[in-house]
């Protein structure tokens, strides 16, 4: 009986040791994606809403469109919104009237946190701009008036003004700076 007890204790200890060696921490090698996240704020809204569709849907006059170079993964599903809150009056306050058939849209472009920057690349400065577009314009029309947009064959947005220079929705290891924020 004593032998069986000792064997059981040894077996449990061995399993615990092997588990800690063989099974690394779930976050240690977790992968996710670095990409341009698309956010919207309806007229009068003060917070961002992640767009559930691409930038090919109509947007109302007085809206703010937001783009952020961001990251998400299985354990970090919520992409970071632009650091600047949507504020149409601050962005478009100086553009009081527009010609018939046009609309004003606030645009916020956030090039992300330094820890997301692809190696060897220089991050452009974040910016806001009031964009006057045709009344039927969609999000990509607003964006294309301000920055050079590079897309993948499927239409997935890869880069603004050549940032990032080569990648498109790259799979990367979860940045250490994000692991502690969960």
Q: Would you name each region that the model predicts?
A:
Residues 2-11:
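Bacterial N-terminal signal peptides that target proteins for export
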């Amino acid at each position: 009986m004593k032998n069986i007890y000792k064997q059981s204790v040894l077996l449990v200890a061995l399993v615990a040791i092997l588990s800690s060696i063989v099974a690394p921490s779930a976050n240690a090698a977790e992968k996710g994606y670095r990409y341009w996240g698309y956010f919207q704020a309806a007229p009068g809204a003060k917070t961002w809403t992640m767009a559930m569709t691409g930038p090919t849907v109509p947007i109302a006059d007085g809206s703010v469109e937001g783009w952020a170079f961001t990251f998400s993964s299985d354990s970090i599903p919520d992409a970071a919104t632009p650091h600047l809150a949507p504020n149409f009056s601050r962005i478009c306050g100086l553009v009081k009237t527009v010609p018939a058939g046009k609309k004003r849209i606030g645009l916020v472009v956030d090039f992300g946190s330094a820890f997301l920057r692809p190696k060897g690349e220089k991050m452009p400065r974040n910016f806001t701009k009031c964009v006057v577009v045709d009344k039927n314009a969609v999000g990509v029309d607003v964006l294309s008036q301000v920055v050079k947009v590079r897309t993948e064959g499927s239409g997935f947005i890869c880069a603004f003004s050549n940032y990032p220079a080569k990648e498109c929705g790259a799979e990367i290891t979860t940045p250490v700076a994000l692991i502690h924020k969960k």
